[in-house]
Amino acid sequence: MDKLSIRDLSLEGKKVLVRVDFNVPIKDGKILDDVRIRSAMPTIHYLLKQDAAVILVSHLGRPKGGVFEEAYSLAPIVPVLEGYLGHHVPLSPDCIGEVARQAVAQLSPGRVLLLENVRFHKGEEHPDEDPSFAIELAAYADFYVNDAFGTSHRKHASVYRVPQLFPDRAAAGFLMEKELEFLGQHLLVEPKRPFTAILGGAKMSSKIGVIEALLSCVDHLVLAGGMGYTFLRAMNRQVGNSLVEESGIPLAKKVLEKAQALGVKIHLPVDAKVAKQCDSGEDWRELSIQEGIPEGLAGFDIGAQTIELFSKVIQESATIFWNGPVGVYEVPPFDQGSKAIAQCLASHSSAVTVVGGGDAAAVVALAGCTSQISHVSTGGGASLEFLEKGSLPGTEILSPAQS
């Protein structure tokens, strides 16, 4: 990695501002999935062992900005943090201002302070409108650490402006290092071959950039989910009422042509689980794509033959990247295709397997095989943008590695 690491910092007795991504799902004040909190713990534990005072900065959800909204408070994070750390973690009721400055001043080495949601201030998402916001945050600490890969594609104050105020003192945390290692080194720089990318999800248009970027480095491209039907329509297949982006058909044709020119093998569904609607998961059947899906029916998952086809491609690959479910995984039995992909990745222990995006990560968790995947990225849009562009605003701005 060509960026400064927290291993390079002299931390004893120093205050460290750590940008974490605690944007976790919360219902009725309870956290539904704490993987993002757990993922930040190696960095936090390391800083504490070095006797640093740790100031945690995060956002949660999309508050209006400019006002406190209890629904987006980081208060539910506190008991989870305390459980992992084994000691009290104070929550500053604001991330800037006198109350925050006092909380930082009282913070002792070896302890953690959590600042309230940075998005309660418009200066976080609109740093040009309030440059003083980043300056106030930066004033708290001796060092800055970014461990929020999932937010690093945004030029927000705590991700992009604050590290600029720490020349030669803005470092990557352990989670950030791991993300850059797997998405960078293992996928973009030196992937073991054959290299296969599996892209699902609803919209092709939102992923056209990463599709075109991946064409230059993969050997196989598996396309399924809603976007798969757009590609099938581009090949004049009958897909009935399946989700198709009409405006994306010309783009799909160009992708197919480019793949052929580059020698990239495209794999599309050969059969599908179809129904009139997917709400109940009832009255479905499997149909061959060759025969076509009639009007009035739509595909909501890949069929058994496609599972077999995709599994064979996975098993013959040395590197696999997966983003986006291949069916409506929230509604059984349309979850079977996505779960089969997850289980196939998990069983292929000799390969480098990387899963990016919230939905694909959720499927892997539902299938009970997260621990068997080489790396489950904490970034959805961030992981795709990194693969498309090779860097992110929040990673570019970190200090260079010490020579």
UniProtKB/Swiss-Prot annotation:
The GO terms this record gives for MF are:
ADP binding; ATP binding; phosphoglycerate kinase activity
Do you know which Pfam families this protein is assigned to? PGK
Entry's SUPFAM superfamilies?
A: Phosphoglycerate kinase (SSF53748)
Q: Does the keyword Ribosomal protein apply?
A: no
Q: Name one GO biological process term.
A: glycolytic process
Which pathway does it operate in? Carbohydrate degradation; glycolysis; pyruvate from D-glyceraldehyde 3-phosphate: step 2/5
Q: Pull one GO CC term from this UniProt entry.
A: cytosol
UniProt binding sites for ATP: 207, 299, 330, 357-360
Kindly state which reaction or reactions the protein catalyses: (2R)-3-phosphoglycerate + ATP = (2R)-3-phospho-glyceroyl phosphate + ADP
Which amino acids does the record list as binding substrate? 21-23, 36, 59-62, 119, 154
Q: Where in the cell is it found?
A: Cytoplasm
Q: Which InterPro entries does the entry link to?
A: Phosphoglycerate_kinase, Phosphoglycerate_kinase_CS, Phosphoglycerate_kinase_N, Phosphoglycerate_kinase_sf
Does the entry feature the keyword Transferase, yes or no?
yes
Recorded E.C. number(s)? 2.7.2.3
Q: Which controlled-vocabulary keywords does the entry list?
A: ATP-binding, Cytoplasm, Glycolysis, Kinase, Nucleotide-binding, Transferase
Q: Which PANTHER family does the entry link to? A: PHOSPHOGLYCERATE KINASE (PTHR11406), PHOSPHOGLYCERATE KINASE 1, CHLOROPLASTIC-RELATED (PTHR11406:SF23)
| Family named by the database record | Belongs to the phosphoglycerate kinase family.
Q: How does it assemble?
A: Monomer.
HAMAP family (alphabetical):
Phosphoglyc_kinase
In Swiss-Prot or TrEMBL terms, this protein is called: Phosphoglycerate kinase
Q: Which organism is it from?
A: Chlamydia trachomatis serovar L2 (strain ATCC VR-902B / DSM 19102 / 434/Bu)
The organism's taxonomy opens as: Bacteria, Pseudomonadati, Chlamydiota, Chlamydiia, Chlamydiales
